[in-house]
A protein has these predicted regions:
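ATP/nucleoside-binding phosphotransfer catalytic cores, i.e., glycine-rich phosphate-binding loops
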Residues: 179-182, 186-234
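Glycine-rich beta-strand-to-loop/alpha-helix junction loops that act as flexible
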Residues: 40-45, 130-134, 195
Length: 234
């Protein structure tokens, strides 16, 4: 495990750095393998970076992306991460955005659909961009969720699992589909992007103690052989 920490003066500088890194990794993937595969976090922090990335010159027809996790809501719902990605990256003409859920957001059907989709994209992600909540969750790996143990199991090969946060976050009280820890770690570049002092304090706790049950993000930060680039701004 290794951590490379990048401090930025403000959220704008953070977004610029994320966009540049995503673009660079996509260009490298296209040059070396002819295609690129991304897993992208929802939440407010990374979306300015996605808009900047979408405006960059790239052969988007050879790029596929998916959310790192999704709320089990219809694809047109305001809480849907896929909808947010579509809107942010509308200028990335040709980009294939892969959903983790069915169009109606049924949780059980979505779990099965996500696993089938991941079977078609079995290779390593070129970039996984993660966020983190003040409870230490990343993607939808929430502390206290009954399925957390399954999602953290390094031997799981299905790649995605239904998550029922307990308690449900009041701002988004929905079941989720999340990529598992092992699928998130199957990546050439892993980025964790956070803002604010409160999340910085949680990050320091997760870095200090490898306790994924308390801080699920620790499963990524302390994974053997993984290098995580942590981008932070006040």
């Amino acid at each position: 495990m290794a951590w490379v920490q990048h401090r930025h003066d403000d959220a704008g500088a953070l977004a610029d750095a994320l966009a540049a890194t995503l673009h660079r990794q996509c260009e490298r993937a296209l040059a070396e393998r002819g295609h690129a595969l991304l897993a992208l976090a929802g939440g407010r922090t990374p979306f300015p970076a996605y808009r900047a990335l979408a405006a960059a010159e790239l052969d988007w027809s050879r790029v596929a992306a998916m959310p790192t996790d999704e709320r089990c809501v219809p694809h047109g719902h305001a809480a849907c991460n896929l909808r947010g990605l579509r809107e942010a990256m509308v200028t990335a003409h040709g980009l294939a955005l892969e959903p983790l859920t069915t169009a109606d957001g049924d949780p059980d059907a979505s779990e099965a659909a996500a696993r089938m989709m991941l079977a078609r994209h079995a290779g390593a992600f070129d970039v996984v961009l993660l966020g983190m909540g003040e409870d230490g969750h990343t993607a939808s790996l929430f502390p206290g969720a009954p399925q957390l143990g399954a999602a953290l199991d390094p031997t799981r090969a299905d790649g995605a699992v239904r998550i029922d946060p307990d308690p449900l976050p009041p701002e988004a009280p929905f079941p989720r589909i999340s990529l598992t820890a092992s699928r998130l770690l199957h990546a050439r570049c892993i980025i964790l992007a956070i803002t604010g002092q409160a999340k910085r304090a949680v990050l320091e706790q997760a870095l200090a103690v490898a306790d994924p049950r308390r801080h699920p993000v620790a499963a990524i930060l302390h994974a053997p052989g993984a290098t995580v680039h942590v981008h932070w701004s006040p």
